[in-house]
Amino acid sequence: MSNTHFHCRKLKNKLMLTLSFLAVFFGLFWLCWILFTLITKGIPALSLELFLEKTPGPGEKGGLLNAIIGSTLMITVSTLIGTPIGILAGTYLAEYGRYSQLTKVTRFLNDVLLSAPSIVIGLFIYAIYVSQVKHYSGWAGAFALAIIIIPVVVRTTDNMLNLVPNNLREAAASLGCPQWRVITMICYRSARAGILTGVLLSIARISGETAPLLFTALSNQFTSFDMNGPMANIPIVIYQFAASPFQDWNELAWAGATLITLFVLLLNIFARIFFPQKSK
């Protein structure tokens, strides 16, 4: 009887290992296929003109300069808006309101916002901002992206500060340090690697967002630093050019997709190299 049970358990173990391997292979297969397609079609489309010329008309030569400028401006502004708000909100949840009912409700609402479709956020900014000023703008796009950043940074900051040992807080408090100094000088220093990693990953997330920008920044064909009007950006250019019947536009769409992928990849590599998570 014992041998029968032993062989049965071995069979179940092999079956589960096989299913796990197939699941991993299934996921990696599609990832490798996507990367292979992106490399074979995107890398040949990269050129110096891509960074020096604005988006062209049909049948013309051009690049993505205006889209790169627009995306850079909106990502920078949204990061400057969303990061401080997210860090301060996460600090309140982890340090000041750790055991309050408000904190539990706030964490739940933050998780809801974290999983909300980005198109809903775009519609929200359109309703409260774009429809009031009667025109699309880079500011509206930056506000939408900032709302996407905030819950990511809140969750990361909250989690990282909760990992800081209470012994450090108690030791500082016993020396007479006020709570704000304990947070800034001890908790932030202990959790800074995780917090900065969360900020970088939130930037990587908004880099490819298209839906919220359709209702806020839209796009244009000009090189502009003015965020008070419609502003070109790489995700919208990819969306427009990929669906066009013109071969040169299709190539620019693949080049834009490659740029975003490389940017996200570099951010992830940077975060892992310079802000590694310490094992316990």
Curated annotation (Swiss-Prot):
Keywords: Cell inner membrane, Cell membrane, Membrane, Phosphate transport, Transmembrane, Transmembrane helix, Transport. It is a multi-pass membrane protein. GO terms for biological process: phosphate ion transmembrane transport. Residues 68-271 form the ABC transmembrane type-1 domain. InterPro entries: MetI-like (IPR000515), MetI-like_sf (IPR035906), Phosphate_PstA (IPR005672), Phosphate_transprt_permease (IPR051408). The chain crosses the membrane at residues 19-39, 68-88, 108-128, 133-153, 195-215, 251-271. One of its GO terms (cellular component) is plasma membrane. One of its GO terms (molecular function) is phosphate transmembrane transporter activity. Its main location: membrane. It is found in: Cell inner membrane. Belongs to the binding-protein-dependent transport system permease family. CysTW subfamily. Part of a binding-protein-dependent transport system for phosphate; probably responsible for the translocation of the substrate across the membrane. PANTHER family: PHOSPHATE TRANSPORT SYSTEM PERMEASE PROTEIN PSTA (PTHR42922:SF1). This is Phosphate transport system permease protein PstA. It comes from Pasteurella multocida (strain Pm70).
